[in-house]
Amino acid sequence: MTVSLARLERQLGYTFKDQELMVLALTHRSFAGRNNERLEFLGDAILNFVAGEALFERFPQAREGQLSRLRARLVKGETLAVLARGFGLGEYLRLGSGELKSGGFRRESILADALEALIGAIYLDAGMEAAKERVTAWLTSEIESLTLVDTNKDPKTRLQEFLQSRGCELPRYEVVDIQGEPHCRVFFVECEITLLNEKSRGQGVSRRIAEQVAAAAALIALGVENGHD
């Protein structure tokens, strides 16, 4: 074990039995050989479960849609990158030369992905309880700062935060039709996102309202909300 990895383990609050798992979790796809993408996939699933369970227990009166919105905030890339920077994770990443030169060790998405990969690695190294304990410890202050007021956001904001938490492109809104007289127009808007094969649609007496309706429809189509929250 190198001194640097031992230092990172102290920051994480976890000592790996299998050091190769830790090294793999820190290996970006730009680096030659095996990379951390599979561990990231596993860690993402564990993170969502642990965060969901913690929110379920903290907010017993919250509706499903509220819990989903809180979890999206909790596991979004920005939150994970802040945690990763707190651990000094960037200096331990194994990056290809091009990614290294372009400052990949500072990039939000790379840091967030590596942290998820470490969660997956801890799970494989010591099981679910160990992974759950570390994730809960890392997120405790963030969870405690959340309130149900955080769910009282408009659909466009909720959709944007959900997509950002998944590392997806932001939605694109387009006015496809305007009907009616100038004093009583109705705007028709389509919302396009990469996770859906079909565009969601909305209409309203202003472009802003139509976009909000389209965003709400997209959230329902994604299964994030059920239309009754």
From Swiss-Prot:
Active-site annotation: D44, E116
RNase III domain sequence ranges? 5-127
EC number(s) stated in the UniProt entry for this protein: 3.1.26.3
Give residues annotated as binding Mg(2+): E40, D113, E116
Q: Which SMART domains match?
A: DSRM, RIBOc
Q: Name one GO molecular function term.
A: double-stranded RNA binding
Q: Which UniProt keywords apply?
A: Cytoplasm, Endonuclease, Hydrolase, Magnesium, Metal-binding, mRNA processing, Nuclease, RNA-binding, rRNA processing, rRNA-binding, tRNA processing
Give start and end of each DRBM domain. 154-224
* Source organism, top-level taxon: Bacteria
Q: Where in the cell is it found?
A: Cytoplasm
Coarsely, its chief localization is cytoplasm
Q: Which reaction does it catalyse?
A: Endonucleolytic cleavage to 5'-phosphomonoester
GO BP terms in the entry: mRNA processing; regulation of gene expression; rRNA processing; tRNA processing
Q: Which cofactor does it need?
A: Mg(2+)
Q: Name one GO cellular component term.
A: cytoplasm
Q: What does this protein do?
A: Digests double-stranded RNA. Involved in the processing of primary rRNA transcript to yield the immediate precursors to the large and small rRNAs (23S and 16S). Processes some mRNAs, and tRNAs when they are encoded in the rRNA operon. Processes pre-crRNA and tracrRNA of type II CRISPR loci if present in the organism.
Quaternary state and interactors:
Homodimer.
* Similarity comment: family membership: Belongs to the ribonuclease III family.
HAMAP family registered for this protein in UniProt: RNase_III
Output this protein's name.
Ribonuclease 3
What species does this protein belong to? Pseudomonas fluorescens (strain SBW25)
